[in-house]
Design a protein with these regions (language model features):
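P-loop NTPase motor domains
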Residues: 44, 48, 54-60, 122, ...
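Accessory regions of macromolecular translocation/handling assemblies
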Residues: 1-208, 215-228, 528, 532-556, ...
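Conserved long hydrophobic alpha-helices within structured protein cores
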Residues: 149-155, 412-419, 513
Length: 628
């Protein structure tokens, strides 16, 4: 041991650990300075901090090893361990090539050990072996709630979603499209529609489907008193409705095509065998030609469905006389002479390629499709326009669309209106409002399945968010959506960040919700008891997975409860919103019948002539001289 301790002293000439490395050190310092300026420097240091420490310690040990005396490597290592503290008398590293190389080898060795250990490591998720599903809590929903109560979408008693599409932290941004599912009597109107109407944020307009026309009576006065412009489209009682004329909103030829497609998608013609067979395509040509002629050439007061019916009635076709020309043919001949490239002329010429017998069948199909317009009240309803759909995003407006929940005869009118509404608002946002409407337009689409097919709705709902438009699709079951929109139903649901389930028993809906909620891990306790000559008793514990809420549990869910699913957040099992606790509940007719809204009186008031309106004045001489 004496021989081992004797060389423990350092050599007579113990050089400083900076010796011979000044130039190298300056170069390294310059490189470190350059790297420090990068944006990811902090992250880089944190990730490599353990390896930097390993490099430093091994490099200092290498420096000490070089200055230890001994006859063999073992002797020098023993001296190193006995005097290890001397390596850190100076905190500065050594820049000797040998020391640096040994330090790098040490750091690389640590990196390799960690890599292979991590690669072969067992993955444990204690308590989550079969699933990690759980119910959300107040902490989960808190970042999504606006401090100002009115500036939220009401979802449940304890959960809300801020109306702003640009929260402080972008990761909490969600679109305001909501799927509400609830069977008959589950409270879709009471627990969702009315509470959100009572919110009345400063810059929000409403468009809502009103089955049976009860919501406008119960909430209309509150909205009117708050300064909302009330609009009513009533397909149950036309006398209690404002006028709606789709022709008023045609701005270009593409709008004509959209209108025709919507009419065909939501009505049926005689002779129609499939959605896109010969007869339907031929009808489309005729509709485009006639509507194009009416829009371009007819005076404004004649641009309506009544004129379209007159054109079809005058479009006689004879099987035995191919050269016969009806009055409509003559009109188009005159137009062709003036404007041979006219949109209506080009469409009509394609239609006229059909033989007399074929043309007659096409006209019969058109007549069957437009049969509802033979009702004088419907023609009067659509004679001119009072809806001002294009202004919904410019001022506080509440449009009530009253439909029958038992008869869908006139629901095609509603489908046409919604199709035009979406297109008008999107175009106005893009062309006149810099991409966003001045007022957010919320569509509360109660009984969505009864509205009819809105063409390309799956694409519309994916793009309306950026224009300050949102839709709440209210259904009795998910299967209703699939019946109408087929494969596009999944796309529509996928573009709704929020799903609210109020209760129901439809099996496919319960299955999908149960699967979406996921599974949680639970503890399973088993006992065994064997009797006989050698009786035994045993107890075992194990873990297993169970649905957070199974289908049978969903079907018997308490009527006061609901399930909320928000994208990126754990689901919530909460109480339905108590409408009586809202500060504006006393303004509804639910609280006081005196608050009932008189629709007929309001319409009469709205139809009064204003002093600023312009009129055509005609003077008639009724004197005796003129009559003589």
């Amino acid at each position: 041991m004496k021989n081992l301790k004797k060389p423990a002293r350092l050599p007579r000439k113990a050089p400083s650990n900076q010796t011979g490395g000044t130039a190298w050190g300056k170069k390294l310092a310059a490189e470190i300075s350059r790297m420090a300026q990068s944006a990811d420097m902090k992250k880089l240091i944190l990730l490599n901090f353990p390896y930097i420490i390993a490099f430093y310690m091994v490099e200092k040990a290498a420096w000490l090893y070089r200055h230890c005396n001994g006859d063999s490597v073992v002797d020098r290592l023993m001296v190193l361990f006995m005097n290890f503290g001397l390596a850190y008398k100076s905190v500065l590293p050594s820049f000797h090539p040998f020391d640096l190389m040994v330090g790098l080898v040490g750091a690389a060795a640590l990196k390799a050990v960690i890599y292979f250990k991590g690669k072969n490591a067992k993955k444990y998720r204690q308590g989550e072996e079969y699933g990690s599903a759980r119910w959300g809590n107040q902490k989960d929903i808190e970042p999504f709630i606006d401090p100002v109560f009115e500036n939220n979408v009401i979802l449940t008693q304890t959960e809300r979603l801020m109306m702003s599409g640009r929260p402080k932290h972008p990761k909490y941004a969600r679109n305001k499209n909501v799927i509400v599912i609830g069977g008959s009597g589950s409270g879709k109107t009471r627990f969702y529609v009315k509470p959100n109407l009572m919110q009345m944020p400063e810059k929000v307009s409403y468009v809502l489907t009103d089955p049976k026309g009860t919501i406008i009576v119960e909430c209309g006065k509150m909205l009117s008193d708050a300064g909302y412009k009330i609009k009513v489209l009533n397909t149950i009682n036309f006398k209690k409705s404002m006028r709606y004329n789709p022709f008023h909103y045609i701005r270009s030829e593409k709008d004509i095509l959209k209108l025709v497609n919507t009419i065909i998608a939501n009505t049926k013609g005689d002779g129609e065998k499939s959605g896109e067979d010969f007869w339907v395509k031929a009808e489309r040509l005729l509709y485009c030609a006639l509507i194009g002629y009416i829009w371009y050439e007819a005076p404004e007061e004649e641009q309506n469905f009544s004129t379209l019916l007159e054109f079809i009635n005058a479009s006689e076709a004879r099987e035995d006389d191919e050269e016969f020309k009806n009055p409509v043919d003559e009109l188009f001949d005159e137009l062709e002479q003036k404007k041979p490239e006219h949109f209506a002329v080009r469409q009509y010429k394609k239609y006229k390629l059909a033989a007399g017998k074929t043309a007659k069948s096409i006209l019969i199909s058109c007549g069957a499709r437009l049969a509802p317009f033979d009702i004088a009240e419907l023609r009067d309803l659509m004679a001119y326009d009072e809806m001002e759909l294009d202004l919904l995003g410019d001022r506080r407006t509440a449009l009530f669309v009253i439909i029958s929940d038992t008869d869908d005869t006139f629901n095609f009118v509603v489908s046409i209106m919604y199709t035009q509404l979406f297109n008008l608002l999107c175009d106005r946002a893009d062309d006149q409002c810099g991409g966003q409407l001045k007022y957010h337009v919320r569509l509360l689409l109660d009984e969505f399945a009864n509205i009819g097919l809105i063409p390309k709705f799956d694409k519309l709902i994916a793009t309306i968010r950026s224009r300050e438009i949102s839709a709440s699709i209210i259904l009795q079951s998910q299967s209703q959506l699939k019946t109408i929109y087929k494969d596009a139903a999944e796309t529509i649901i996928g573009n709704c960040d929020t799903m609210l389930f109020l209760g129901g028993k439809e099996s496919s809906t319960l299955k999908e919700i149960s699967e979406t909620l996921g599974k949680e891990t639970i503890d399973l306790y088993n006992t065994s008891d064997t009797r006989g000559q050698s009786p035994s008793f045993g107890t075992t514990y194990q873990k297993t997975g169970k649905e957070l809420m199974s289908r049978d549990e969903l079907s018997v869910m308490d009527g006061s409860k609901c399930i909320l699913q928000l994208r990126g957040v754990r689901p919530f099992l909460s109480d339905k919103f108590d409408i009586t606790k809202h500060k504006r509940y006393k303004e509804l007719s639910d609280f006081d019948k005196k608050n009932a809204f008189d629709v007929e009186r309001y319409l009469k008031h709205e139809l009064r002539l204003r002093m600023d309106e312009e009129f055509d004045c005609y003077e008639v001489d009724v004197s005796e001289e003129s009559t003589a």
